[in-house]
Amino acid sequence: MERFVNGRAKGKKIEGYTDIAEFVTSITTPRKIMMMVRAGSAVDELMEQLFPHLSEGDILIDGGNSNYEDTNRRVALAEKKGFRFVGAGVSGGEEGALNGASIMPGGSESAWPEVKPILQSIAAKASDGTPCCQWIGPAGSGHFVKMIHNGIEYGDMQLIAEAYWVMKNLLGLDNGQMAEIFADWNEGKLRSYLIEITANILRHKDKSGGYLIDKILDTAGQKGTGKWAVINAME
């Protein structure tokens, strides 16, 4: 924290705290606190640490990839204690954090008018200037939409991987040829960020002059949202 405050955040209106009580009391009421921690038990643990220091009507926002059923439970728990809770799906990664993300909030509806100007100000903007952030609905609906969003994205990634496999192993195309095909697809109906970066990845060479794609392990990790989407589809 101190390295960030004294580094990239230096000269900006950003303060760092190591004590939760001190952090909470530094915020004017009704407080809006956004949690960006790993989904799962870490969210519950942080909430339990925050609860004793909150005032009635304060708002907690979970911006992680939480399971929507966990968000359903957390909304009910927070409201029972007199607080409000927003489960906000956030898409965009590091680039989105710096230049605007897509944000999908849901939960305690009375919180929306208060967090709307904040979330929409940091959201990406469409070509007509519309913020990529609108209220989704009650309880865990925001995280449900993020789950479906990720499920669709992973499906697209699998299609791209299969197209790559066919071109490489059945058609015998090299990386340069495949990059041109993906770049061509990106000029038409298939245009998308994933298609665009696939072409760029296939072109990329490392310091030795070899294609980096040929040195990457053929495996991928996941945070659970794709699996949850498939389970919900089956149910």
Per-segment meaning from a language model:
Residues 214-235:
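A conserved active-site cap/scaffold subdomain adjacent to cofactor or substrate pockets
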